């Protein structure tokens, strides 16, 4: 290919001319590399040119505004029995009646769907109308497969809050509280959002699962959830054969909350006030929540200074050890290693002898079967959390965050 065609890089086309426009921008004239196409009626391939026509199409910007003109051949149908006499050549980049190149449509979809940009901003950036951009998005939504046709083996369920609580007045029932919670169901393998339901109770999740076909539900092997009794009830009711995997992020979050509550309680008991920056434990409160294996030598030294100077009873250090012990349980490579780490953790919990660590230990025991499933399958809710973040981003982009 010549240099201009290489730079323009429109698949199956080459540049035959390019000029500067008087009011700015450039006009690029392209033509297909090969001449010939099948008749849309009979399918017979023809290479006989009847006439040439020119069509202006939209394409992705190239270092500024570019006006793309396509030189198209109008071919003569070679089949005498066909009712169509002539037809215009089509390609993968310019299908029949297309006004935009295929790569422009792909770029629009990537900007709107993958990056969550507003339709109006994408239309302005690519120099097309809002209606054109929205039509591309609508066309992509139409071809999305039905949920029941997808082969989902690992399912992720998680809730997210999208606004504050609202009260609406029902003429028949009076004031009604509307919870700002929604539950997202995601294919853990691909990250594709399968459904979004109102609320975060078991009835909402059960209703969505029961609406699926029996064959679809039978294929579900593992469901990843956070430590939620409502989600657990919905899964055991609608998917009794599926195993439940508890998300490790939420367990570590509970361990960090346990440590934070111990720190806050100790400050109140010893100083009768809230923590201040003069207190080493408060000043290094985020350091206490970090994993010990991720700390540098300098950070570990600061951590030792916190325990030496601001932990007279040793309860803070004991709670920190329980938090790290739980992390070791979740990081265990095998089930036997996890059980051994759990036994060590039990000793640390008994030694700490605080209400906060005992409550954390009871939670771990209550969800231990789900922890075992996580250790053996490593199915987490990471993609579900990512989907929730994307949903919130789309709502904010659409000015729907109020």
Locate the predicted segments by residue.
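Short, conserved DNA-binding cores of transcription-related domains
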Residues: 1-84
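Short secondary-structure boundary/capping segments
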Residues: 140, 171-172, 237-243, 259-263
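Extended interfacial segments that mediate partner engagement and assembly in macromolecular machines
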Residues: 68-75, 83-157, 166-167
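Short alpha-helix plus adjacent loop in nuclease-associated cores
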Residues: 251-272
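RNase H-like nuclease fold core
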Residues: 47, 132, 136-222, 229-234
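Residues immediately flanking
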Residues: 32, 79, 159, 188, ...
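A structural signal for short, well-ordered beta-strand segments and their strand-loop junctions
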Residues: 122, 156, 224, 244-247
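Acidic/histidine-rich catalytic cores and adjacent linkers
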Residues: 41, 47, 177-179, 187-192, ...
């Amino acid at each position: 290919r010549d240099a201009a065609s290489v730079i323009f890089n429109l698949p199956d086309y080459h540049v035959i001319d390019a000029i500067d426009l008087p009011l700015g921008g450039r006009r690029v004239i392209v033509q297909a590399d090969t001449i010939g196409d099948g008749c849309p009626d009979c399918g017979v391939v023809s290479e006989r040119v009847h006439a040439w026509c020119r069509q202006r199409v939209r394409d992705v910007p190239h270092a500024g505004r570019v006006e793309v003109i396509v030189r198209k051949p109008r071919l003569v149908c070679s089949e005498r029995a066909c009712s169509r006499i002539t037809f215009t050549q089509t390609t993968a980049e310019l299908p029949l009646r297309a006004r935009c190149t295929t790569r422009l449509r792909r770029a629009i979809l990537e900007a709107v769907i993958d990056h969550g940009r507003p339709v109006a901003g994408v239309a302005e950036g690519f120099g097309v109308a809002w209606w054109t951009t929205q039509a591309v998005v609508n066309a992509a939504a139409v071809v999305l497969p039905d949920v029941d046709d997808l082969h989902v083996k690992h399912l992720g369920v998680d809730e997210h809050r999208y606004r504050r609580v609202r009260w609406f007045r029902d003429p028949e029932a009076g004031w009604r509280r509307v919870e700002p919670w929604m539950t997202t169901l995601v294919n853990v393998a691909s990250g594709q959002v399968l459904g979004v339901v109102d609320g975060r109770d078991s009835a909402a999740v059960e209703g969505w699962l029961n609406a699926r076909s029996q064959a679809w539900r039978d294929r579900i092997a593992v469901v990843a959830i956070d430590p939620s009794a409502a989600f657990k009830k919905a899964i055991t009711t609608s998917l009794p054969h599926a195993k439940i995997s508890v998300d490790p992020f939420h367990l570590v979050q509970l361990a960090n909350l346990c440590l934070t509550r111990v720190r806050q309680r100790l400050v109140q008991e010893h100083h009768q006030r809230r923590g201040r920056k003069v207190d080493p434990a408060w000043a290094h409160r985020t350091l206490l929540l970090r994993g010990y294996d991720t700390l540098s030598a300098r950070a570990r030294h600061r951590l030792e200074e916190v325990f030496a100077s601001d932990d007279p009873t040793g309860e803070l250090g004991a709670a920190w050890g329980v938090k790290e012990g739980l992390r070791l349980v979740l990081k265990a490579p095998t089930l036997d290693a996890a059980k051994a780490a759990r036994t060590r953790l039990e000793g640390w919990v008994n030694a700490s002898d605080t209400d906060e660590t005992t409550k954390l230990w009871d939670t771990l025991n209550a969800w231990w079967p789900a922890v075992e499933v996580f250790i053996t399958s490593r199915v987490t809710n990471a993609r579900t959390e990512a989907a929730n973040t994307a949903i919130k981003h789309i709502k904010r982009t659409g000015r729907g965050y109020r």
